[in-house]
């Protein structure tokens, strides 16, 4: 009998779900829209602040892991636990939790990746550095291509170690996120409670 995904070690999960990249797929934007509408259909509007397509699949023209990253920002007055219960009820699986952050996935199966795979990043409003990085890459195609080249190199080196792959990109992401914050100033800093 096969182990359940939640009973697998990180090493077993990395074997089943290796890092792989593919050329940009124009359908990724539509998949994001469909999934964001689905999420809006089961989460009450007062529990949502904003949803965003983030990650490399949101950047046209660069290779990416074919996983749609969604940033779901909620008002600080909302209880993450109640949103977590709803997400689990509607097919999302927990990935990680830390102070004020939860991550979920959908599309991971015992046979490997499903056709459509999603990572949902649940955060309180204001924890959204990924938006600055995304916008900087969209506005600076040479930097986006540099990021793509870095990922292509790291892909084969860390194909079966997602944590190392992510860590190896961190300095690049931090550097350009800081540049973006200086350039775009307070682009995403609305005033909400």
Name what the model sees in each region:
Residues 1-52, 174:
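Helical scaffold of the NTase/Pol beta-like nucleotidyltransferase catalytic core
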Residues 39-78:
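Active-site nucleotide-donor binding segment shared across nucleotidyl transfer reactions
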Residues 92-125:
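Conserved catalytic core of two-metal-ion nucleotidyltransferases
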Residues 82-90:
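Short amphipathic alpha-helices in soluble, non-transmembrane regions
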Residues 17-19, 66-70, 116-118, 133:
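Short amphipathic alpha-helical segments
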Residues 124, 128-193:
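Catalytic cores of NTP-dependent nucleotidyl/adenyl transfer enzymes across multiple folds
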Residues 46, 91-92:
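Short glycine-aromatic motifs
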């Amino acid at each position: 009998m096969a182990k359940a995904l939640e009973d697998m070690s990180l090493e077993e999960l990395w074997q089943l779900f290796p890092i792989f990249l593919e050329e940009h797929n124009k359908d990724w934007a539509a998949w994001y829209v469909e999934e964001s509408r689905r999420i809006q259909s089961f989460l009450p509007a007062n529990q949502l602040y904003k949803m965003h397509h983030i990650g490399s699949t949101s950047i046209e023209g660069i290779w990416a892991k074919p996983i749609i990253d969604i940033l779901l920002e909620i008002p600080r007055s909302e209880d993450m636990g109640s949103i977590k219960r709803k997400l689990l009820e509607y097919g999302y699986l927990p990935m990680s939790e830390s102070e004020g952050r939860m991550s979920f996935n959908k599309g991971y199966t015992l046979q490997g990746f499903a056709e459509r795979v999603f990572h949902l990043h649940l955060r309180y409003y204001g924890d959204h550095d990924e938006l600055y990085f995304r916008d900087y890459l969209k506005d600076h195609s040479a930097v986006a291509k540099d990021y793509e080249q870095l990922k292509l190199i790291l892909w084969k080196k860390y194909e079966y170690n997602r944590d190392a792959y992510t860590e190896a990109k961190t300095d690049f992401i931090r550097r350009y996120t800081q540049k973006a914050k200086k350039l775009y100033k307070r682009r995403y800093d609305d005033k909400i409670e």
